[in-house]
Amino acid sequence: MNSKKKTGSYYTPLDLADFIVQHLKPSLNDTNSILEPSVGDGAFIKTIIANNIPVNQISIVDINDEHFKNIQSIIPQEININTYKEDFLEYNNENKLFSLIIGNPPYIKKNLLQKAQIDSCKSILTAAGLKSSAKNIWTAFFIKSISLLDKNGILAMVLPAELLQVSFAEELRHYILNKFQRIEIITFDNLLFECKGQNTIIFIGYKESKNNGVYFSNIENLSDKKLTLNQNNYITHSPFKWSHHYLDTEDLQFIELLCKKIKLIGDYCETKPGIVSAANSYFIINEETENKFHLHKYTLPILQRGLFVNDDIIYTKEAYAKLIKEGKPSKILCFTEDNTKNINSHVQSYLNIGSQMDFVNGWKCSKRKIWYIIPNISTIPDAFFFKRCHQYPKLLINEAQVYVTDSAYKICMKTGFDLSSFIYSFYNTLTIVCSELFGRYYGGGVLELIPSEFKRLPIPYVAINEKIFQQFYNRAKKAANITEILQENDNYILKDNLKLTEEQFNQV
């Protein structure tokens, strides 16, 4: 496994550290003591010294002390420096508080943490009155740093954009509103850490400030020295995620009011995740592999990824046949205890390959009675929704009768509602906009909706006949983009059915 994933060590580029320090410089005249809790190669300390920030004492903490000597060599003699070779989660220095805490905490998912680290995270979060189930180590670093600020302290950290948008960070967002008088959040158009694959933000919190509130700014790149901070206190107390700070209060209030009048996706259908294979690269195969190992008896048709679907609203038999012809993974192995009692040598060869690749000891496979038997194959869905998308969310009728992986949610209509009407009603601007507002973004502009977010999307359901749906389908096939698909639907769904005024319609 990549060592960076284990240690969370994604060192801060000097230009990013300098950008933050330059922005903070006017607020650092009275800085007495500075702490960098995960110092790494010392990018922040280097830029603080280079910018002549007045400071009496610097403390640096890191689990790896190999950089300490280099950092110490650049710090002027008149500044006291304390070094601590330990995990910051265990750091304890007799309740010493700091004027500035600055850094880039490690990013390590819970499943890669050691038990001692998990226990430390729980203790830190519990002590702060928060839920103890930390999803990632950065949350504990963040909360502990807040607790070490003095009454006028400033916290400046490079954090994952998760803080603004994911469900588990909602509690953190409420927490920081109570801890800081002023908050500044700076977002970027581009990834700052390509290897991380995670959108990044700059968080700055001021314990005391003459200009209170929550301020946001988005910049294209670090060379852009023009930083305009805009206050948006409404979003911090609305049901929307902070990642949509660029929308003004009037727009957010308008959307919130509309959403309250409309039923949700969860009112019309049941949703379940698709098949969890535990190792798609092994259990989902193409036709060539199926032929080579004589696996025809053991496979079922499957659509693995949303990327394999064109911009369509029906996944047709022809589309699936094309997927097979292109050599894409399109068959899932469905072994059972019965059908593997007398397997031939070809099939056994394929199972041996899986054993040699150590899938048997994988986290999910190891929990199975027989490692290669996938549980809960379940049923073929009538329709499916891909939880991740690029240009727009995709909800499709499953004409091809294929299974789906857990990259999609299976759709089953509740009694009294029609699937074609549901698909038609989904493709309107309000529902698509809300998917952007309710979901979360990952590196490269990927939008994801977790099950709870998908189920609470508002959908102005209208019952239509098959003739109207066929017209919609034909129009969608010819459309150059999602905007063309939505335009015609909006007139009928939002104007005629939802009875929006011309002004409201244009605002949507």
Functional labels for PLM-detected ranges:
Residues 5-21, 38-56, 61-70, 80, ...:
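Signature of N6-adenine DNA methyltransferases within the class I
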Residues 23-29:
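Glycine-rich helix-loop-beta junction characteristic of Rossmann-like nucleotide cofactor-binding loops
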Residues 30-40:
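Conserved class I S-adenosyl-L-methionine
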Residues 253-465:
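Polybasic, glycine- and aromatic-enriched phosphate-binding surface used to engage nucleic acids
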Residues 240-283, 346, 463-508:
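Non-catalytic DNA-recognition/assembly elements of restriction-modification systems
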Residues 212-219, 315, 344, 466-471:
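Short, charged, solvent-exposed linker or helix-capping segments at domain edges/interfaces
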Residues 33, 100, 382-383:
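Structural motif
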Residues 1-2:
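N-terminal, positively charged/glycine-rich alpha-helical extensions of SAM-dependent methyltransferases
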